[in-house]
Amino acid sequence: MPLALYDTWSRTVRPFTPIRAGQVGMYGCGPTVYDDAHIGNLRTYVFEDLLRRVLERNGYAVRHVVNITDVGHLTSDADEGEDKMEKGSRRTGESAWAIARRYTEAFVRDWHALNLLEPTIWCRATDHIAEQIAFIETLDRAGYVYRTDDGLYFDTSRQDDYGYLARLDRAGLQAGKRVALGGKRSITDFALWKFSPADVQRQMEWDSPWGRGFPGWHIECSAMSAKYLGTLFDIHCGGEDHIAVHHSNEIAQTRAAHGTQLANYWMHGHFLTLDVHTKMSKSSGDFVRLQTLQRRGVDPLAYRYLCLTAHYRSKLHFTWESLDAAQTALNRLRHLYIGWPDGGRVDADFAARFDAEVNEDLNLPRALAVLWDLVRSNLPPATLKATVDSFDMVLGLGLREWRPVAVDVPEHVRALLGERARARAEKDWAQADRIREALSAEGWRVEDTPEGQRLFGMAMGASEPDVPPQ
């Protein structure tokens, strides 16, 4: 079936039609690099990677641009508080520039660990100050800019449909405001350029026609997407937390400057939650980093697999139990895959079923079900491998690259594994769990399979020691 995608602007799933035949321009809002990304952030990038892979499976050449916010993102999205980069500098004692480099490198490591395709272009906000100033000048000439004591602001009252992406009730927001506007005319107006305080030496500041300072958060994406994709491109992605503020403001800027709504399709991923109601976020302190998973012996691709189990527009509830289940499923798939021979052909019927699911707004949970139906089928092993290979071009689980790695297992670990096998045979589940935790504390991961226990080392990936199932 033809590709159809959910568009936040229209609130509908609609057929995908590119601006230029066979080509797609796609922009994703990247991280603010003042700290490590958490796995909730990374879920959004897994969704965007899956989108790109599905587009490429449908024959499109994708020009994929991802920005790095390394200046201008204040601690409050309402243009209040301290620049997150400067705050990170005070927290660590490093310069803001060093903070940006360190966390950009960490983010790119996470990106690669999750087997995300390399963007066509990475673009940093600090490398595009001139473009942002030029964009603000265009807005100023068009009459959308006014000045306050602390900076230049965008006048949202000039656009009757401002906030349509989020279906904002502007009148209700204005009537119910509970904060001082600090010179802003409206609660929805937002900063384009912030002035450096006269008595403060900032680490990140630049000269501009209006005075020394730094750009607001939203202007970077309008300016950089215009440079690399044009003033109207196909798809703009991000987390759903960007809808009400950041993406609404990007649209406002670009419509004022160029008369377009920036992108023809707006796509947003849902939150990862730590419990039924709590969104994972740095500001709340409720978050888990990818490195946390790795230290516990979890392959990052197990987290990618977990992301496949929920539709990108649905909440994904994170638990260690669900992650363990994802690791077990991934390891089972890997061990099956590595035993199949090469030389087969893709099964057309299963491929058609898989494509029908991924082309229906990226329904990866159902596509994953097709994969397991395939694995359980009676098709020849070489056909299974060729077809799973084809699916993995979308799933991105790196099956062809994976290899088990033998490691030495100390005798006392083998003894604990034997004790645990006896405890399970005697249905002493509490003792079996205690031994599992003891092994985990020493850097070993135990999985229970239909064939018995499997022991894995804590090396990245499912490194299997030379211990037979027990």
Curated annotation (Swiss-Prot):
Motif 'KMSKS' region, residue range(s) on this chain: 279-283
Motif ('HIGH' region) on chain: 31-41
InterPro entries in UniProt: Cys-tRNA-ligase, Cys-tRNA/MSH_ligase, CysS_C, Rossmann-like_a/b/a_fold, tRNA-synt_1_cat_dom, tRNAsynth_Ia_anticodon-bd
Keywords: Aminoacyl-tRNA synthetase, ATP-binding, Cytoplasm, Ligase, Metal-binding, Nucleotide-binding, Protein biosynthesis, Zinc
Needed co-factor(s): Zn(2+)
Catalyses which reaction(s): tRNA(Cys) + L-cysteine + ATP = L-cysteinyl-tRNA(Cys) + AMP + diphosphate
MF terms in GO: ATP binding; cysteine-tRNA ligase activity; zinc ion binding
EC number in record: 6.1.1.16
Binding site for ATP: K282
GO cellular component annotations of the record: cytosol
A GO biological-process term: cysteinyl-tRNA aminoacylation
Binding of Zn(2+), residues: C29, C221, H246, E250
Localization in the cell: Cytoplasm
Superkingdom per UniProt: Bacteria
Subunit structure as annotated in this protein's UniProt entry: Monomer.
Sequence similarity: Belongs to the class-I aminoacyl-tRNA synthetase family.
Protein name: Cysteine--tRNA ligase 1
Gene source species: Burkholderia lata (strain ATCC 17760 / DSM 23089 / LMG 22485 / NCIMB 9086 / R18194 / 383)
Lineage: Bacteria, Pseudomonadati, Pseudomonadota, Betaproteobacteria, Burkholderiales
